[in-house]
C-alpha cells in the first residue's frame, strides 16, 4: 500500500492508502476535489475513514458519495455527522483492502474524536500534530493528555499521519519552550528545508515526536521547568503542565487553527 498525503485548503492533508491496482482508503477528505483529481490519475475510492466531525475533515464526503453512492464511510457516533455511514468506536477493528485498523477513542479536540492505527501508521486527525497537539474545543485537559499518552505508548516506529501541516509553526512554540533541545533544533531545520522544497513534513516517526514534541514530554524536567517559569509557580501535576502548555500555545504569536 502506498501512503500519499493530498493537500487540501491551506494546510490540511487528506491521507490516502493506495493498493497496486489503484483502490484506495481515504482518511478525512475535507474537500472532494483532491480525490477527484487523483481519480483522474487512477485512484479508485474504496472506503472513507473519518476521525471527527469538523468540516475541514468531512466536507468533501457528500460530493464523493454523489459520485460513488456505495462508498462505505466509517466515522464516530456523532449526530453532527449528517451522512449515511457506519458508526464505529473504541475497540472496533476494520479490515479494508487487506489492512486491519484498530479504532481508539481519543477525546479532547472533540468529544467523539477517533484515531485509526494500522500497519504502524497512525491517523490521528487533530489529536496529535507534528510538534504539537490540537486545541481542546470540547474535552478537558485531562482527557486530551490521556489521549496523547495513549498514542505516545505505541511502538516508536509508528508513523504519525496528522491532519494538518503545522510543523514549522509548532516548531516555533516548541523551541520557545525547549530552546536547548538539539533534536528539536535539527527537526526545525529539516522541516524548513522540506517546506522550501514543496514537500510535506509528514509522516513523522513517533520516536521523533517523543524526543521533540513538548505536549508528549510533559513529564520531562525541561518542560516542567519551562511551565513553572511561565506560571511563576510550580505546577500542581502533569495535567497542569499540559494545560499550561496548551493555554500558552493558544496565545503564542504564531497560531494554528485548529
Curated annotation (Swiss-Prot):
Textual note on the cofactor: Binds 2 Zn(2+) ions per subunit.
Q: Which SUPFAM superfamilies match?
A: Metallo-hydrolase/oxidoreductase
* An example Gene Ontology molecular-function term: hydroxyacylglutathione hydrolase activity
Please provide the record's keywords in A-Z order. Answer: Hydrolase, Metal-binding, Zinc
- InterPro entries under this entry? Clx_II_MBL, Glyoxalase_II_hydrolase, HAGH_C, Hydroxyacylglutathione_Hdrlase, Metallo-B-lactamas, RibonucZ/Hydroxyglut_hydro
- List its EC numbers: 3.1.2.6
Task: List this protein's GO terms for biological process.
Answer: methylglyoxal catabolic process to D-lactate via S-lactoyl-glutathione
Question: Which cofactors, by name?
Answer: Zn(2+)
> Where Zn(2+) 1 is bound, by residue?
52, 54, 109, 126
Q: Which SMART domains does this entry report, sorted A to Z?
A: Lactamase_B
Describe its partners and assembly state.
Monomer.
Recorded family membership? Belongs to the metallo-beta-lactamase superfamily. Glyoxalase II family.
**Which protein are we looking at?**
Hydroxyacylglutathione hydrolase
What is the scientific name of the source organism? Xylella fastidiosa (strain Temecula1 / ATCC 700964)
Q: Which gene encodes it?
A: gloB
